[in-house]
Amino acid sequence: VRQREEVQEVPRRDVSDAPPALPEPIRRDPNPGFSNAFLHHVYDLAWVVAVLCFGPVLWWRGRRNPELRELVLERLLRRSVGRGDGRPVVLVHGVSVGEIKGARSLVKRFESERPDLEPVLSTTTSTGARVARTLYPHLRVVRFPADHSRVVERFFDALAPTCVVLVELEIWPNF
């Protein structure tokens, strides 16, 4: 679990005020430290070993199952997360269907109160992605990447979110 030494609070705004200034986009762990970096490398090595062991099985099954192939390609960021419209991104992450449905009022509120921000939904499961694309056809819906530090880093570099909202607390080591 990453510890953040500084917390930046965004002040509440009055209705008459302009939106508050946004913080810099989230790109990397702000406090990696030696022990955290070492543990992340060990975890990444375990991912590489798992991919080497199970990669051929996934490749074989993916040849017969296009949905599985698409899932693997999206999770490894071989499919683009898409380009936004230039507004700062707020990443709303819900693991599956329940969290995506639960985020509905939050997303509506973002759209009505902060039209200067672009809500982007991310989900882990195929059913969550299907429901998100149905409920929010006007928003970008992306698959959360596999939990390898380089893949997660590329994901955050591509999206450059200003804020990440976790609908339900589910944290992986590289997130």
Positions of predicted regions on the chain:
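Short, Lys/Arg-rich, polar N-terminal cytosolic tail immediately upstream
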Residues: 22-34
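Residue-level detector of intrinsically disordered, flexible termini
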Residues: 17-20, 45, 131
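Intrinsic-disorder-associated, low-complexity terminal segments enriched in Asp/Asn/His/Tyr and depleted
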Residues: 14-17, 29
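N-terminal cationic amphipathic segment used for targeting or macromolecule association
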Residues: 8, 16-19, 49
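Extreme N-terminal basic, low-complexity initiation segments
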Residues: 2-14
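Short hydrophobic helices that act as membrane-entry/anchoring signals
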Residues: 32, 36-62, 74
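Active-site and donor-binding regions of nucleotide-sugar-utilizing enzymes
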Residues: 22, 55-175
